[in-house]
Amino acid sequence: MTIYKGKCMKIWLDDIRPAPEGYVWCKSVNIAKRTIESAEEPILLIDCDHDLGDYAYDGGDGIKLLDWLAENERFYPIKLHTMNPVGRENMLRMIRRYW
């Protein structure tokens, strides 16, 4: 496990639920991608929802961020907070396969 001394980024991908304190709130997959690409500090965690509602037009649902991370070999720690059981299982299957 890598321990960072200093500032780290935690990303919260969700269209409705506000980010907890200390997280950067991204409402769409494309916003999350831009946030990751421009991060100036190490990314400690990405906490994902699956269903992004009105923001799905901007990059798809949360699983699309996992697709992009795997394609770009960016294997940050992932946590899921989605309430969609099918979406959660699909995301977990992807995490088990690539992470």
Regions found by a protein language model. Name each.
Residues 1-99:
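Catalytic phosphate/metal-binding cores of nucleic-acid and nucleotide-processing enzymes, i.e., regions
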